[in-house]
């Protein structure tokens, strides 16, 4: 944590006790407004924009649990039971409804697409029900009257009551994000789920039936029989599931049958055939049923080029996988699709960020995943055509510009399910080092404490500027694996952000381990995974401390805290019929009206052009090659990174 010099947590007037200085306040209650937190060992740091749970102007009665602390009977804990009766309100607290939560996360720093605030978080019935200040109306006054939406787009601070039925999770000094959403998962091996949860991913969307050739190449669970068996297989895991059906067909009947069986969308993949006719036919079914189409386009350009694919799409919404092209797609200019307003572009993590090893590992990955024969020259040429360092270098910059909206893994099929979040933040770090602060994170032109030119300064000594931070960049990158994939798949009303009314799929991070190893993964309000020590130890902390499944990952709990996402059409046909499942089904919202403009912090559509001979990439007048990057005419060296944060020092054991 970095200390900001020009404000304190207590009033300037001294009372019977000396006011707390910022370091002292942080030691007791965690960082507060205007304090900065470094993310892992990266060059990124975030600044707390507001403190709804205390801090400047609100200090006193911060909720802390423990011996001699606040959350005790007749202090921070009220006598109000969990269900005090319908219609009861606490009139002494300004009409605030007295409905204590099941769990409160105290004094945690929330990092989400809408902003960065410190807050208490209330969870009830598996959902987020309030962000703001936990208190006891019998002994404390409320701090908030509803306020305004944070940054005009986020939640409003709310006061809520801690009761005797409330559990406490300490958020002091920690960061809270929404659970990760991976839209590109090949369901090959059950162990993938543990890897995903241990990395902070709580929603998996994709397809597969195991290590079959069709599944190692394509994220498809084809046909009702396989869909039923896959739902049954995934029922025991505390993750939300969305299955992709096979869209590479001209059979409308087949696709509708798969929707009725429970798919969340379709995958059109070149290995099954990604012709313009197939794309158009699948999108017709998508328009009828409201589901999304995920596209792995035609690398060989057999049935047409990238413009032919765009013509077949006809300005309809589409989720384009690994838009850079190494994972598959029109060679060499697939990446130009980021310019289209109807395309929701995504990356897969093997190309994130471009390093000295990125190109070297891709050839073998392509050969294995797509069942290619090294003895066949045409197969070798196919693999080689997909590996272009110039477009990988451009992908770095397009992420930082907000032109690529989504990050995903491509799990076990040219991607690593446990590294989606980590590689997102590694990319953000590389861009921070190379490009500096985003314009949105730069200070105002005029120093604080002065008026316009020609007028008398307000103060001869300008107020010190707070240190710069990477808030907008952090908000941009966290959105790539939370809210934006949720929007693309029609599940944003349920998951994807830390907002009231949504499922409590949350990840708690120690700042030093941010993006690498979650401290705790909360799934549907219950702790499902956490860093815990030896089970035979006398306390939870002795080594080896490992990410381990918790009670939310055992017994029947996963079915109560997770969803299978399907269409409203499927729910009307009773998806539980003929299946023995504990996990509930949840209807998605229609995805057909979701376009690039709806992607949070990542809706840029710069003009992108690729030289067909040299593979040189031009981004809005900037030139990108595999050696040197030109952004707005300024040369930026070292496109290949030789050292990254969030890497070996975190994985010695």
Where is each model-derived feature located?
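Divalent-metal coordination cores built from histidine and acidic residues
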Residues: 2-94, 133, 145-177, 193-278, ...
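Active-site core of metal-dependent hydrolases
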Residues: 265-478, 487-489, 531
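Active-site microenvironment of metallo-dependent hydrolases
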Residues: 1-151, 158, 197, 202-203, ...
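Flexible, glycine/charged-enriched surface loops at secondary-structure junctions
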Residues: 234, 238-242, 294, 434-439, ...
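Short beta->alpha connector loops
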Residues: 111, 186-188, 246-250, 272-273, ...
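A short, charged/proline- and glycine-enriched loop
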Residues: 98-104, 165, 174, 181
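Histidine-centered catalytic micro-motifs
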Residues: 178-189, 293-300
